[in-house]
C-alpha cells in the first residue's frame, strides 16, 4: 500500500506520537469528532444538566409525595439511578469562586448561563487590574533606573584611583618595603645597620637581624666567584643546626658573603635567602623580612638588641681577613683554617644567645600574665562603678517622676477647687 501504516498526528500544543492503524482509524475519528461537536438532542427527550457545569453539588431534594405517585421502574438498578459523573474541578477553577446558587427546579439550564456571564465579567476585571499593576511596576522600575544610573559613575572614581595606586606601587617596590617597615615597627627595633661600611656589610647586617627571629625565609643566591670559596660556604652551612641551600651571587667576593651568612645561621631555625647583585635589592629583601618577622614576634625584637652588639664586633673582625682572601684567590687554605676557628666561635655565641632567649622568654611570659591580670581587675572595677552610677541615676529619675506627678496632682486639685468656686 502507498499509504503509510502509522502516522504522526499532532493536535494543538500536544506533540505526542499517536500511532493509528488503518482498521481503527474510522472509530477513532468518530470518537474524537463527537468530543469536539456534541450530538444534537433527540426529539422528545429532556436535556439533563450535567453536575460538572452546576456549582451546587448538594444532594437533590426528593419530594416523597411525588416519588409515591411516580415510582421508578422495577427493572432500573439503584446504580443506574445515580448520575455517575463527578463535578469537574477544572471548570470550577475556570469560573472562579461564585456564591452557590439556590436550588433550582425546572430552570436549571437558565441559571448556568447567568453564572457563566458573571464569571466572564470577573475575569475581565482581573485582567484589567493585572495590566494596571504591570504598568505601574514598569514606571517605578524606570524611575529607579534613572536614580540608580549616577551611582555607578561615583563608584568608578575610586576604582581608577586604585588602579593608579597599583601602578605607582609596581614602579617603586623599594618605597613600599620602606613603608611596610615603618608601619609594622615595634618599639625595640635594632638601629645598628648604618654602622657597617657600604660594602656587603650592610646587606649582612640587615639579613642577620631578620634571621634572629625564629622563623625565616628561603634564599637563592647565584655565584660568579671562585669554586673554592663556594665550597667553603657550603661546608659552613652543613655545620650549623639547620643549614640552608646556598647559591652565592653578586659582583662582590663570595668570601665576604660566606662570612656574613655564617653568623646569621647560628640562630635556631635558619633561612634560605634571595639576595640580588645590587645593594638596593639586598636592602629591600631585608626590610620585607623584617616586616614579616615583626608580625610574628614582638618579643623577638628585644632579643635582637642583645645579639646585634655581639655580632657586630665579630663581623668587623671577620671582614678584614675575608677581604684579603678575595684580593688574592690563591690563599684558600689559610681562609679554610680561619673558617674552622670562626665556626667554633659562632657555635659558642649561638649557645649563649639561646640561654639568654630562654631566660627572657620566661620573664616575658610572667610579665604578660601580670599585665593581663591588672587589666582584668581595672575592667571589673570600672564595670562595678558604672553599675553603681546607673542605679543612682535610675533612683534620681524615679524621684523626679514622682515629684512631677505630685505637682500635677496638686495642680489638678487646685483647678477643680477653682472651678467649683466659680
UniProtKB/Swiss-Prot annotation:
Disruption phenotype: CYLC2-knockout male mice are infertile. Knockout spermatozoa show morphological defects of the head, altered nuclear shape, acrosome malformations, acrosome detachment from the nuclear envelope, abnormal manchette elongation, bending of the neck region, and/or coiling of the flagellum. Sperm motility is markedly reduced. The keyword Cytoplasm applies. Residues 39-59, 101-422 are annotated as: Disordered. Sequence repeats lie at residues 179-205, 206-232, 233-263. It is found in: Cytoplasm, Cytoskeleton, Perinuclear theca, Calyx; Cytoplasm, Cytoskeleton, Perinuclear theca. Testis. This is Cylicin-2. It comes from Mus musculus (Mouse).
Amino acid at each position: 500500500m502507498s499509504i503509510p501504516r502509522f502516522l504522526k498526528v499532532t493536535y494543538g500544543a500536544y506533540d505526542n506520537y499517536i500511532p493509528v492503524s488503518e482498521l481503527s482509524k474510522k472509530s477513532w475519528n468518530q470518537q474524537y469528532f463527537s468530543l469536539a461537536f456534541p450530538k444534537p438532542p433527540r426529539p422528545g427527550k429532556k436535556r439533563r444538566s450535567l453536575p460538572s457545569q452546576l456549582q451546587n453539588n448538594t444532594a437533590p431534594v426528593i419530594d416523597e409525595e411525588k416519588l409515591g405517585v411516580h415510582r421508578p421502574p422495577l427493572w432500573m438498578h439503584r446504580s443506574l439511578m445515580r448520575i455517575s459523573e463527578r463535578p469537574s474541578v477544572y471548570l470550577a477553577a475556570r469560573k472562579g469562586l461564585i456564591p452557590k446558587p439556590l436550588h433550582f427546579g425546572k430552570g436549571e439550564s437558565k441559571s448556568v448561563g447567568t453564572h457563566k456571564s458573571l464569571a466572564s465579567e470577573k475575569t475581565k476585571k482581573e485582567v484589567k487590574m493585572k495590566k494596571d499593576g504591570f504598568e505601574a511596576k514598569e514606571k517605578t522600575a524606570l524611575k529607579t533606573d534613572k536614580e540608580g544610573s549616577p551611582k555607578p559613575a561615583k563608584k568608578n572614581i575610586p576604582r581608577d584611583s586604585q588602579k593608579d595606586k597599583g601602578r605607582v606601587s609596581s614602579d617603586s617596590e623599594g618605597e613600599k618595603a620602606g613603608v611596610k617597615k615603618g608601619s609594622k615597627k615595634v618599639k625595640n627595633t635594632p638601629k645598628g645597620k648604618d654602622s657597617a661600611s657600604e660594602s656587603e656589610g650592610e646587606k649582612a647586617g640587615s639579613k642577620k637581624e631578620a634571621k634572629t627571629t625564629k622563623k625565616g625565609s628561603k634564599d637563592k643566591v647565584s655565584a660568579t666567584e671562585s669554586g673554592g670559596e663556594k665550597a667553603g660556604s657550603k661546608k659552613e652551612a652543613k655545620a650549623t643546626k639547620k643549614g640552608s641551600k646556598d647559591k652565592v651571587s653578586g659582583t662582590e667576593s663570595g668570601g665576604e658573603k660566606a662570612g656574613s651568612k655564617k653568623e646569621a645561621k647560628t640562630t635556631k631555625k635558619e633561612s634560605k635567602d634571595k639576595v640580588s647583585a645590587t645593594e638596593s635589592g639586598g636592602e629591600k629583601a631585608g626590610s620585607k623580612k623584617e616586616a614579616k618577622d615583626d608580625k610574628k614576634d614582638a618579643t623577638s625584637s628585644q632579643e635582637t638588641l642583645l645579639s646585634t652588639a655581639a655580632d657586630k664586633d665579630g663581623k668587623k673582625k671577620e671582614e678584614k681577613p675575608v677581604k684579603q682572601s678575595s684580593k688574592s684567590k690563591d690563599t684558600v687554605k689559610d681562609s679554610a683554617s680561619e673558617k674552622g676557628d670562626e665556626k667554633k666561635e659562632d657555635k659558642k655565641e649561638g649557645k649563649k644567645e639561646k640561654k639568654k632567649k630562654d631566660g627572657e622568654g620566661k620573664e616575658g611570659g610572667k610579665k604578660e600574665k601580670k599585665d593581663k591580670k591588672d587589666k582584668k581587675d581595672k575592667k571589673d572595677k570600672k564595670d562595678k562603678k558604672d553599675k553603681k552610677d546607673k542605679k543612682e541615676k535610675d533612683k534620681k529619675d524615679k524621684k523626679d517622676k514622682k515629684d512631677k506627678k505630685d505637682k500635677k496632682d496638686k495642680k489638678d486639685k487646685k483647678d477643680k477647687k477653682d472651678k467649683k468656686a466659680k
